[in-house]
Regions:
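Hydrophobic h-region of N-terminal signal peptides that target proteins for export
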Residues: 10-19
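Short, low-complexity interaction segments enriched in Ser/Thr/Pro/Gly
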Residues: 1, 18-23
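Bacterial N-terminal signal peptides that target proteins for export
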Residues: 1-7
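Formylglycine-dependent sulfatase
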Residues: 22-377
Length: 377
């Protein structure tokens, strides 16, 4: 049997062959299902979509399966997650905007109890169900201590009503975050099931931690006599831009040529890859007309792009770990793999987006100068 992979852009589906024989065939031969969701991944951020970023594992899946060129999404962010989990339009699922209660039908900020999740359906039909990663479909009102935790760890008992946690919406287990944005080295709202994780070990990086957990669970599922459904939702490459030094080093010179050169090179590769067949026209003008050579923060921006690339690189490395675990345990040939992003790349922190200096060195989003200690207390 062929395994099936789907990369959705961002989207993709693939067929490959496992080198390992199934170790102890299960009596229930329905396919395992692995859904992998990236966060704010751009259309051209993968090698198989023209990127200079090193993504060999996802590129291999794309080559073996189906790569989508016209995969559209009617929502974004947490509304995407609500739709993906329920098969409903985001308003029907209860999250028409974000995870804040606007006190309007369709805008309650929490996954509706009337919306059945795919995990609930598959669990009822005999699947083992697991979630690893970012939830972001439960109302998480910001309290002062939570805001402080984004910069400095302050323990808080719960991050939304427990009835809305993944383990109470069809998942047998969940390791990951409830909230939508975290410090990658000290993540806010990290839980194991319903229990907050108070401390993380030295050298912790959430992207790697999620990959490690997913690979471990894949190996454990090989011992069970039923298929599994795993929803792996990475936080990367959503801001804040935080990556491991060894990954950043790979790209420290890549983006010094500037965004125009990178954009044009990606487009040329996309044409060569057949993503835009028969199109010889030039790219449309960029939304912002500032030229790289006139950019006073070129060094800063080149570094930021390098960190962004490093975050994606680490996601791909993790997916390689998971594929290896599937192959080693003889499960790859009977696993459906889907990879997609909740939306395209984020433009929230671009210079001049709102007529002010956004995300510049030592500046706030409204252009005010800030001074703060570089080390977390």
């Amino acid at each position: 049997m062929n395994s099936k992979f789907l990369l959705l852009p961002t989207a993709l589906m693939v067929a490959g062959h496992s080198a390992a024989e199934a170790k102890g065939k299960k009596s229930d031969q329905r396919p395992n299902i692995l859904v992998i969701l990236a966060d704010d991944l751009g259309y051209s951020d993968l090698g198989c979509y023209g990127s200079e970023i090193h993504t060999p594992n996802l590129d291999k899946l794309a080559k073996q399966g189906v790569r989508f060129n016209h995969f559209y999404n009617t929502s974004r962010s947490c509304p995407t997650r609500a739709s993906l989990l329920t098969g409903l339009y985001q308003h029907q699922a209860g999250i028409g905007r974000m995870t804040f209660d606007d006190h309007l039908p369709g805008y309650r900020g929490t996954l509706s109890r009337n919306a059945v999740t795919i995990a609930e359906v598959l669990k009822e039909s005999g699947y083992a169900t697991s979630m690893v990663g970012k939830w972001h479909v439960a109302e998480t009102p910001l309290r002062k201590d939570q805001r402080e935790w984004l910069a400095h760890h302050v323990f808080h008992d719960t991050f939304s009503d427990l009835c809305h946690y993944p383990v109470n919406r069809g998942f047998d287990s969940h390791y990951g975050i409830i909230y939508g944005v975290v410090d990658y080295f000290d993540p806010f709202s990290l839980v194991e099931g319903e229990v907050p994780v108070k401390e993380v070990p030295e050298g912790y990086y959430i992207t790697q931690a999620l990959s490690d957990r997913a690979a471990k669970e894949v190996e454990e599922y090989a011992k069970e006599d039923k298929p599994f459904f795993m929803y792996l939702a990475y936080t990367a490459p959503h801001w804040p831009l935080q990556a491991l030094p060894e990954d950043i080093k790979k790209y420290e010179d890549t983006y010094k040529v500037g965004w125009e050169a990178i954009r044009n090179a990606r487009y040329e590769r996309q044409k060569q890859l057949g993503i835009f067949p028969g199109m010889d026209n030039f790219l449309s003008e960029r939304q912002f007309h500032d030229k790289w050579e006139d950019n006073p923060h070129a060094e800063w921006d080149a570094r930021a792009m390098a960190v962004h690339a490093a975050m994606i690189d680490r996601v791909d490395q993790g997916i390689g770990q998971i594929i290896e675990a599937l192959e080693k345990t003889g499960q790859l040939d009977n696993t459906l793999i889907l990879f997609l992003s909740d939306n395209g790349c984020s433009n929230e922190d671009c210079q001049n987006m709102s007529g002010r200096e956004n995300d510049r060195p030592d500046m706030t989003r409204d252009g005010k100068k800030i001074i703060y200690p570089r080390n977390k207390q």
